[in-house]
Amino acid sequence: MGRSFYHFLMTYRDPKLTDQKTEFANNAYRDHSFPKQTRNYHILCDYLEFNAPYLPGMSIFDELWEAYLLDEEKNKH
């Protein structure tokens, strides 16, 4: 079984970078309610839409979700 989206997202954390993906990762790290164990797209979308004012747009999440799926597929074998 692969890692959760949250664990994938944490690979983008960096205290010095300020791009949108890094900011999302840093803010999710500080968000104690973030669904850390889920791998479900819909659960994550619902959470982010209603509880993540730090995310300026869902396109950032969508890009990272696609990267997450590719990474999971690559690491499956």
From Swiss-Prot:
**A Pfam family assignment:** YozE_SAM_like
Q: Would you identify the family this protein belongs to, as annotated?
A: Belongs to the UPF0346 family.
Name of the protein in its database record = UPF0346 protein lin1971
Organism encoding this protein: Listeria innocua serovar 6a (strain ATCC BAA-680 / CLIP 11262)
